[in-house]
């Protein structure tokens, strides 16, 4: 733990090197065999295995997801846009306020600047894959749309009804809600079989977990495609219901 590390460093600073190293080794050994450490190691391997094998999940062949739409350009929406564009996807971010779009763009520019391993041309190409818009039309043909608007079921129903007709033929509509039941939100959808919950954690660029929530009518193909999408953007997808 951080407390033990600090204590060990402080105590070791007053000792000769051999005794300080012995003190450090004893402290490390005590932490390494503690119940907390064992639980963290077990959880790490569980998540890694789940991400690689997806045991128990449907084997339906997932159709490609190449173009995604994101509704809402806040921190969540901008984060989703960046991680998706970083994996080569075409992204459209739609918001009702230009100020929000400008903030989302600035967020992605700042994230791109942190990628020191990328050349300037590669950063420019990444950012160019993201379209920022006040209009609905650029969302046409999206294979997946994720709404990240306010936690209000009426607002979510409205954007579902506005955007669903623009989806690709087999397009999926997903909600990033953290509180509203997916089956309830799916009532606003025309095709409930392709309505699903994709709950990301903020900041999206750093948090690895992706919770997938199925509605009562969500089909296996939709689930399989969303699992594939989650793995593509580097997340650990877990079906929570």
Describe the residue ranges of each PLM region.
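Internal alpha-helical scaffold of NAD(P)-dependent oxidoreductase catalytic cores
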Residues: 212-241
């Amino acid at each position: 733990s951080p407390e033990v590390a600090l204590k060990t460093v402080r105590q070791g600073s007053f000792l000769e090197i051999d005794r300080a190293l012995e003190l450090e080794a004893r402290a490390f050994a005590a932490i390494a065999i503690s119940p907390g450490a064992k639980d963290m190691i077990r959880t790490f391997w569980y998540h890694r295995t789940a991400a690689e094998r997806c045991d128990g999940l449907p084997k339906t062949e997932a159709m490609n997801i190449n173009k995604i739409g994101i509704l809402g350009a806040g921190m969540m929406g901008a984060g989703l846009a960046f991680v998706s564009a970083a994996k080569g996807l075409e992204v459209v971010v739609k918001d009702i306020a230009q100020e929000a779009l400008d903030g989302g763009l600035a967020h992605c520019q700042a994230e791109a600047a942190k990628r020191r391993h990328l050349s300037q041309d590669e950063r420019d190409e990444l950012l160019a894959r993201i379209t920022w818009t006040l209009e609905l039309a650029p969302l046409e043909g999206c294979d997946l749309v994720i709404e990240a608007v306010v936690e209000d079921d009426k607002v979510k129903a409205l954007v579902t009804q506005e955007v669903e007709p623009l989806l690709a033929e087999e397009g999926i509509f997903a909600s990033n809600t953290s509180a509203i039941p997916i089956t309830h939100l799916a009532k606003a959808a025309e095709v409930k079989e392709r309505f699903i919950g994709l709950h990301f954690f903020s900041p999206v660029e750093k948090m690895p977990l992706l919770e997938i929530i199925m509605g009562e009518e969500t089909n296996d193909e939709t689930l399989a495609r969303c699992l594939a999408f989650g793995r593509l953007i580097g997340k650990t997808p877990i079906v929570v219901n």
